[in-house]
Amino acid sequence: MAAPVPWACCAVLAAAAAVVYAQRHSPQEAPHVQYERLGSDVTLPCGTANWDAAVTWRVNGTDLAPDLLNGSQLVLHGLELGHSGLYACFHRDSWHLRHQVLLHVGLPPREPVLSCRSNTYPKGFYCSWHLPTPTYIPNTFNVTVLHGSKIMVCEKDPALKNRCHIRYMHLFSTIKYKVSISVSNALGHNATAITFDEFTIVKPDPPENVVARPVPSNPRRLEVTWQTPSTWPDPESFPLKFFLRYRPLILDQWQHVELSDGTAHTITDAYAGKEYIIQVAAKDNEIGTWSDWSVAAHATPWTEEPRHLTTEAQAAETTTSTTSSLAPPPTTKICDPGELGSGGGPSAPFLVSVPITLALAAAAATASSLLI
C-alpha cells in the first residue's frame, strides 16, 4: 500500500507546476512602454508592489541578478542599446506576474539634413531628408513647403520614405521657395528649414548608356556615345550640355572635354594599347548645376594584329632548299677501257662502275626515306 504515495507526490508537483506555468503565461495586460536615453540611469518600479516586497525580475525571459534590485525596484545604470527589452516583475513565491515594462533605449533627434533638387525640370522638384545620427527609436517627420505665402502639396514618394515631390505651379518665378521640416520622437524634437530660388536646384541625373568603342585602324582614337537621362522630360525645349572626362588606367590625371550639344564624342589623343575609363556628366544649358558622373565605360584603342612569321619569300626559299637537299649527287663518268691504259683488261669498266652504282642506290634510298 506504500506504492501509491510517490504517485500522489508526483501528481501534486505536476499540479503545482501547472499552476505556476499558468500564472506566468496567462494573458496579462499590455506592458507599459517606456523610452530612456542612451547612457542614462533608470529605476523600474514593480508596479504597485511595496518597496520591500519579495520579487524577482526577468528580461526577455532571463532572470536578472539580485544585486540589480533596490528593494522591489530594478535599477539600471549607464543604459546601452542592449538594455532594450521586455522587463517583467514576479512575486518571488507565487511567481505571480506583478508588472511588465517594454523598455526602449535611444536618443533624441539632432537637426535633420534637408536638401531639394529638380531632376525633372520643368515638371517639379523633390526634397529629401535624413538625420545625421541614428536615434534607435521611431521618429516622426513633418514637411511644409511654401512658395511665397502659398502652401504647396508635398506628395510622399512611394518607394523612399524620406522623400516627397512638389510640382512647379509657375515657371520662371522669382518668388523663393521655403521648405521646413520638423522631427520628433519620444525623447525630443528638432527642426530646420531652407530657402532657395527655382533655378538654383536644377540638377539632371547622370547620362545613361555610356559606351566607348575603338575606331578601326586608328590606334589613338575612341568613339564615345551616351544618352540623355530618361528622367529629363523635355530635352528639346530644355537642352542639356555635357562634360566628358577620360584617362588611361595607368594614370590618375583626368582629361576633360565640354560639349555644348550632341551625345557623341571621339577621343583623338588616347595612348595606343592602353585601357581607358570614360565618364560623362550633364547640365541644363542655362541654369542649375552639373549632374553626378555617369557609370564608367571602359575601352582600349584599336591595335594591329600581329602578322604570321612565314612570309612568301621565306616560303619560296624554304621550298628551294628542300628540293636541293633531296636531289641525288652528280653521276660519275665511267671511264672508257681505252682511257685506263695498259693492264686494265676487260674487267676494268666493271670494277669502276660498281662504286658508282652503289652511290646512286644509296642516294635514292636517302631521298625516299626523306619523302616518306
Curated annotation (Swiss-Prot):
GO terms for molecular function: ciliary neurotrophic factor receptor activity; cytokine binding; interleukin-11 binding; interleukin-11 receptor activity; signaling receptor binding. Nervous system and skeletal muscle. A lipid is attached at S342 (GPI-anchor amidated serine). It is a lipid-anchor; GPI-anchor. InterPro entries: FN3_dom, FN3_sf, Hematopoietin_rcpt_L_F3_CS, Ig-like_dom, Ig-like_dom_sf, Ig-like_fold, Ig_sub, Ig_sub2. Glycans are attached at N60, N70, N142, N190. It comes from the Eukaryota. It holds the Pfam family fn3. Belongs to the type I cytokine receptor family. Type 3 subfamily. Forms a heterotrimer with LIFR and IL6ST. Interacts with heterodimeric neurotropic cytokine composed of CLCF1/CLC and CRLF1/CLF-1. Either alone or in complex with the heterodimer CLCF1-CRLF1 interacts with SORL1; this interaction may promote internalization and lysosomal degradation. Component of a receptor complex composed of IL6ST/GP130, IL27RA/WSX1 and CNTFR which interacts with the neuroprotective peptide humanin. Binds to CNTF. The alpha subunit provides the receptor specificity. Receptor for heterodimeric neurotropic cytokine composed of CLCF1/CLC and CRLF1/CLF-1. Acts as a receptor for the neuroprotective peptide humanin as part of a complex with IL6ST/GP130 and IL27RA/WSX1. The WSXWS motif appears to be necessary for proper protein folding and thereby efficient intracellular transport and cell-surface receptor binding. This is Ciliary neurotrophic factor receptor subunit alpha. It comes from Homo sapiens (Human). The gene is CNTFR.
